[in-house]
Amino acid sequence: MTKESADNYYNPLMLWGYDVFVQVLTNSFWWRCSTKGILVPFFLDNSTTNHMEVGAGTGYFLRAKLDHERSKLKSSDDKTLWPQNLTLVDFHERCMNKAANRISPVRPNRVLANIMEPIPLKGQKFDSIAIMYVLHCIAATPEAKGRVFANLKPFLADEGTLFGSTVLGKGVKHNLIGGFLMWLYNYIGMFDNWDDGKEDFLKPLREHFEVVESEVVGTVLLFKAEKPRH
């Protein structure tokens, strides 16, 4: 997705309805990868107190993490240890503001950037980097999207984990409504993923990281990578 199309689609009304339509309906029935059953546990398991969130969206997963950590507290007076350091990276300021407001009073760092280019954030290392439901929105060939991992690698600590998810267009079977949504989203420019297959992402991940794990659930690729190559 280009900056111009993001401005058109990620408007306040769309962001308001995103969680219901995507996180509840689309993921469960049409992408067939449950938000509560698959994606939230995946995020909780891999995110740390020193975290970079790439493509913050509505802040849905960040809020789930914050609520999860708060549920562990013995008293309402206790303060959660999450996050100690949180940075949001997005090329759309409206999404970053939405996500930041959702996890108030947490005050994350905000970096406005295009992840297809080097990210203007020097000298920082994170124990976890998440890129959830971002890659299928990038207007680029599958091969070009691999640059994202090269651009994120410098910010991952040696013992850290980069993880994410993306809707695939190749090598998976979409149901009737899922196929229609794929056509619609690609037609209007919200998605650019008809040619995105599992190996298109695993290949560059293996080039940049020593340990790569993946799983396809429904039409969604889940991946995690560790031990960045130097």
Swiss-Prot record:
It holds the Pfam family Methyltransf_12. SUPFAM superfamilies: S-adenosyl-L-methionine-dependent methyltransferases (SSF53335). Keywords: Methyltransferase, Transferase. InterPro entries: Methyltransf_12, SAM-dependent_MTases_sf. One of its GO terms (molecular function) is methyltransferase activity. Disruption phenotype: Blocks the production of aurovertins and accumulates the unmethylated precursor produced by the HR-PKS aurA. Its EC number is 2.1.1.-. Pathway: Polyketide biosynthesis. GO terms for biological process: methylation. Methyltransferase; part of the gene cluster that mediates the biosynthesis of aurovertins, fungal polyketides that exhibit potent inhibition of adenosine triphosphate synthase. Belongs to the methyltransferase superfamily. This is Methyltransferase aurB. The gene is aurB.
